[in-house]
């Protein structure tokens, strides 16, 4: 099962019972798995790990494989007897995984995004009937457009603001809409 896990800057997990050191490609093993009690913990939803390791500048966030005995709860938390970190993710990659998760599970996401957003230095995510988001160079703009009479996702657009193909500024479904656009204006269009 593909899951997500956060760590401190040394890839040590300090939540739970003691410290545990992980490594990319190295399988960690536990005797038992019970969510919020014992085992190796992770989340199904990418941004779920930010509740535990939320510093995008220093914490490490990975996509992992959970295997062995697996126990899940209704909040998307996973405990397993085997956990292998597969790859470190940039904050931008983590946000893209979150957008894909929301597209597949529009009603199960614990995260709430407004119809208008500005970047946090890494990404901006907007969700709604007419989403708009702004990004500076080096960030990712993610737009999740909902159907008119539903919260299911109709369209997902991702813009890597590189300053060449995609310039800094505001984006809506369909692309670039301007360099300067106030939040109030974007919410009312």
Which stretches of residues belong to each language-model region?
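Short, glycine-biased loop/turn motifs at secondary-structure junctions and
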Residues: 1-189
């Amino acid at each position: 099962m593909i899951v997500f896990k956060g760590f401190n800057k040394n890839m040590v997990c300090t939540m739970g019972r003691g410290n545990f050191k992980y490594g990319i490609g190295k399988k960690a093993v536990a005797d038992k798995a019970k969510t919020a009690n014992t085992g190796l913990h992770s989340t199904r939803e990418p941004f779920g790990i930010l509740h535990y390791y939320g510093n995008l500048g220093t914490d490490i966030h990975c996509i992992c494989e959970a295997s062995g005995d697996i126990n899940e709860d209704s909040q998307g938390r996973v405990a397993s007897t085997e956990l292998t970190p597969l790859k470190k993710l940039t904050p931008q990659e983590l946000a893209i995984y979150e957008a894909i998760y929301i597209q597949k599970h529009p009603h199960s996401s614990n995260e709430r995004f407004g119809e208008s957003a500005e970047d946090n230095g890494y990404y901006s995510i907007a969700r709604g009937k007419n989403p708009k988001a702004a990004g500076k160079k080096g960030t990712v703009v993610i737009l999740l457009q909902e159907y008119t009479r539903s919260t299911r996702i109709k369209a997902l657009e991702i813009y890597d603001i590189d300053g060449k193909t995609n310039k800094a500024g505001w984006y809506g479904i369909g692309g670039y809409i301007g360099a300067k656009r106030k939040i109030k204006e974007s919410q009312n269009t």
